[in-house]
Amino acid sequence: MTQPNLMSDRSTRILRTAGWSIAALLLIAPAIAMKFDHTGVNWTASDFIFAGVVFALVGGLFELAARASRNISYRAAVVAAVASGFLQLWITLAVGIIGSEDNPANWTYIAVVLTALSVSAVAIGNPRALSRAMAVMAGLQLLFCALHLVDGHFTAVIDLFFTSLWIMSSRLFKRAADQTTG
Protein backbone atom coordinates (compact mmCIF):
# COMPACT_ATOMS: atom_id res chain seq x y z
CA MET A 1 0.00 0.00 0.00
CA THR A 2 1.40 3.39 -0.95
CA GLN A 3 0.95 6.48 1.13
CA PRO A 4 -0.74 9.37 -0.69
CA ASN A 5 1.93 11.88 0.33
CA LEU A 6 4.84 9.83 -1.04
CA MET A 7 5.99 9.78 -4.63
CA SER A 8 6.40 6.38 -6.30
CA ASP A 9 9.72 5.28 -7.77
CA ARG A 10 8.14 5.24 -11.23
CA SER A 11 6.92 8.83 -10.90
CA THR A 12 10.34 9.86 -9.64
CA ARG A 13 12.04 8.28 -12.67
CA ILE A 14 9.62 9.98 -15.06
CA LEU A 15 10.13 13.40 -13.45
CA ARG A 16 13.91 12.99 -13.33
CA THR A 17 14.02 12.06 -17.02
CA ALA A 18 11.71 14.94 -17.92
CA GLY A 19 13.76 17.40 -15.86
CA TRP A 20 17.10 16.50 -17.42
CA SER A 21 15.49 16.45 -20.89
CA ILE A 22 14.10 19.96 -20.37
CA ALA A 23 17.52 21.17 -19.21
CA ALA A 24 19.12 19.70 -22.34
CA LEU A 25 16.48 21.29 -24.58
CA LEU A 26 16.98 24.68 -22.90
CA LEU A 27 20.69 24.38 -23.56
CA ILE A 28 20.18 23.34 -27.19
CA ALA A 29 17.55 26.03 -27.96
CA PRO A 30 20.01 28.97 -28.21
CA ALA A 31 22.28 26.92 -30.49
CA ILE A 32 19.36 26.30 -32.83
CA ALA A 33 18.22 29.93 -32.62
CA MET A 34 21.72 31.09 -33.57
CA LYS A 35 21.34 29.30 -36.91
CA PHE A 36 18.81 31.96 -37.88
CA ASP A 37 20.29 35.43 -38.36
CA HIS A 38 17.17 37.39 -37.47
CA THR A 39 16.77 36.04 -33.89
CA GLY A 40 19.36 38.26 -32.24
CA VAL A 41 20.64 35.29 -30.22
CA ASN A 42 24.43 35.35 -30.09
CA TRP A 43 25.81 33.11 -27.36
CA THR A 44 29.52 32.54 -26.89
CA ALA A 45 31.11 29.30 -25.74
CA SER A 46 31.34 30.75 -22.23
CA ASP A 47 27.57 31.45 -22.29
CA PHE A 48 26.89 27.79 -23.06
CA ILE A 49 29.34 26.64 -20.39
CA PHE A 50 27.77 28.93 -17.80
CA ALA A 51 24.25 27.78 -18.71
CA GLY A 52 25.35 24.15 -18.60
CA VAL A 53 26.87 24.59 -15.15
CA VAL A 54 23.77 26.37 -13.84
CA PHE A 55 21.43 23.72 -15.28
CA ALA A 56 23.64 20.97 -13.81
CA LEU A 57 23.52 22.66 -10.39
CA VAL A 58 19.74 23.02 -10.55
CA GLY A 59 19.38 19.41 -11.67
CA GLY A 60 21.78 18.32 -8.94
CA LEU A 61 19.68 20.09 -6.31
CA PHE A 62 16.59 18.27 -7.59
CA GLU A 63 18.49 14.98 -7.48
CA LEU A 64 19.50 15.66 -3.86
CA ALA A 65 15.88 16.41 -3.00
CA ALA A 66 14.74 13.19 -4.65
CA ARG A 67 17.21 11.24 -2.53
CA ALA A 68 16.50 13.19 0.67
CA SER A 69 12.77 12.46 0.74
CA ARG A 70 10.01 10.75 -1.21
CA ASN A 71 7.50 13.15 0.33
CA ILE A 72 5.69 15.13 -2.38
CA SER A 73 5.45 18.28 -0.24
CA TYR A 74 9.19 18.16 0.45
CA ARG A 75 9.98 17.84 -3.24
CA ALA A 76 7.54 20.61 -4.19
CA ALA A 77 9.17 22.84 -1.57
CA VAL A 78 12.55 22.22 -3.17
CA VAL A 79 11.12 23.11 -6.58
CA ALA A 80 9.77 26.44 -5.24
CA ALA A 81 13.04 27.31 -3.49
CA VAL A 82 15.23 26.33 -6.44
CA ALA A 83 12.95 28.24 -8.82
CA SER A 84 13.31 31.39 -6.72
CA GLY A 85 17.08 31.04 -6.49
CA PHE A 86 17.57 30.07 -10.12
CA LEU A 87 15.42 32.89 -11.48
CA GLN A 88 17.11 35.50 -9.28
CA LEU A 89 20.56 34.33 -10.31
CA TRP A 90 19.74 33.96 -14.01
CA ILE A 91 17.97 37.31 -14.40
CA THR A 92 20.54 39.18 -12.33
CA LEU A 93 23.50 37.82 -14.25
CA ALA A 94 21.84 38.02 -17.67
CA VAL A 95 20.35 41.51 -17.69
CA GLY A 96 20.14 42.72 -14.10
CA ILE A 97 17.01 43.28 -12.07
CA ILE A 98 18.04 46.79 -11.05
CA GLY A 99 19.35 48.59 -14.11
CA SER A 100 21.97 46.60 -16.00
CA GLU A 101 23.70 43.49 -14.72
CA ASP A 102 26.61 45.76 -13.69
CA ASN A 103 24.56 47.67 -11.08
CA PRO A 104 25.99 46.81 -7.62
CA ALA A 105 22.48 46.77 -6.13
CA ASN A 106 21.91 43.51 -8.03
CA TRP A 107 24.30 41.82 -5.61
CA THR A 108 21.47 41.77 -3.07
CA TYR A 109 19.77 39.11 -5.21
CA ILE A 110 22.94 37.05 -5.40
CA ALA A 111 23.31 37.43 -1.61
CA VAL A 112 19.83 35.97 -1.12
CA VAL A 113 20.67 32.97 -3.32
CA LEU A 114 24.03 32.34 -1.61
CA THR A 115 22.40 32.61 1.81
CA ALA A 116 19.68 30.17 0.75
CA LEU A 117 22.29 27.68 -0.47
CA SER A 118 24.27 27.99 2.77
CA VAL A 119 21.36 27.51 5.16
CA SER A 120 19.87 24.74 3.03
CA ALA A 121 23.16 22.83 3.03
CA VAL A 122 23.10 22.82 6.83
CA ALA A 123 19.42 21.87 7.08
CA ILE A 124 19.11 19.39 4.19
CA GLY A 125 16.91 16.43 5.04
CA ASN A 126 15.26 18.27 7.94
CA PRO A 127 12.00 19.73 6.61
CA ARG A 128 11.22 21.66 9.79
CA ALA A 129 14.62 23.41 9.71
CA LEU A 130 14.26 24.02 5.98
CA SER A 131 10.83 25.56 6.59
CA ARG A 132 12.38 28.03 9.01
CA ALA A 133 15.26 28.71 6.63
CA MET A 134 12.90 29.51 3.75
CA ALA A 135 10.89 31.83 6.02
CA VAL A 136 14.15 33.65 6.79
CA MET A 137 14.83 33.88 3.04
CA ALA A 138 11.41 35.49 2.55
CA GLY A 139 12.26 38.00 5.27
CA LEU A 140 15.65 38.73 3.73
CA GLN A 141 14.02 39.23 0.34
CA LEU A 142 11.57 41.71 1.87
CA LEU A 143 14.39 43.52 3.68
CA PHE A 144 16.25 43.98 0.42
CA CYS A 145 12.99 45.10 -1.24
CA ALA A 146 12.66 47.84 1.38
CA LEU A 147 16.30 48.86 0.87
CA HIS A 148 15.75 49.01 -2.89
CA LEU A 149 12.71 51.25 -2.40
CA VAL A 150 14.65 53.57 -0.06
CA ASP A 151 17.38 53.72 -2.70
CA GLY A 152 14.82 54.74 -5.34
CA HIS A 153 14.53 51.41 -7.16
CA PHE A 154 10.98 50.11 -7.58
CA THR A 155 11.51 46.35 -7.47
CA ALA A 156 8.53 45.49 -5.28
CA VAL A 157 6.71 43.41 -7.91
CA ILE A 158 9.59 41.06 -8.66
CA ASP A 159 10.73 41.03 -5.02
CA LEU A 160 7.23 40.04 -3.90
CA PHE A 161 7.19 37.31 -6.56
CA PHE A 162 10.45 35.88 -5.19
CA THR A 163 9.19 36.31 -1.62
CA SER A 164 6.04 34.35 -2.49
CA LEU A 165 8.20 31.47 -3.77
CA TRP A 166 10.21 31.45 -0.51
CA ILE A 167 6.98 31.49 1.52
CA MET A 168 5.49 28.70 -0.60
CA SER A 169 8.64 26.66 -0.05
CA SER A 170 8.51 27.33 3.70
CA ARG A 171 4.87 26.24 3.95
CA LEU A 172 5.49 23.10 1.88
CA PHE A 173 8.51 22.12 4.02
CA LYS A 174 6.34 22.62 7.11
CA ARG A 175 3.67 20.38 5.57
CA ALA A 176 6.32 17.76 4.83
CA ALA A 177 7.54 17.95 8.44
CA ASP A 178 3.98 17.59 9.74
CA GLN A 179 3.34 14.61 7.44
CA THR A 180 6.55 12.97 8.59
CA THR A 181 5.80 13.35 12.29
CA GLY A 182 2.12 12.54 11.89
Predicted feature residues:
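Membrane-helix interface "capping/anchor" motifs
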Residues: 66-75, 121-133
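N-terminal membrane topogenic signal
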Residues: 7-22
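Loop-to-helix transition at the N-terminal end of transmembrane alpha-helices
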Residues: 40-58, 72-80
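C-terminal halves and exits of single transmembrane alpha-helices
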Residues: 82-110, 114-124
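Membrane-embedded alpha-helical segments in integral membrane proteins
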Residues: 23-39, 62, 85-95, 142-143
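Structural signature of hydrophobic alpha-helical transmembrane segments
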Residues: 43-55, 99-112, 156-160
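Membrane-interface helix-boundary motifs at transmembrane edges
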Residues: 8-12, 65-77, 178-181
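Central hydrophobic cores of alpha-helical transmembrane segments
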Residues: 80, 131-142
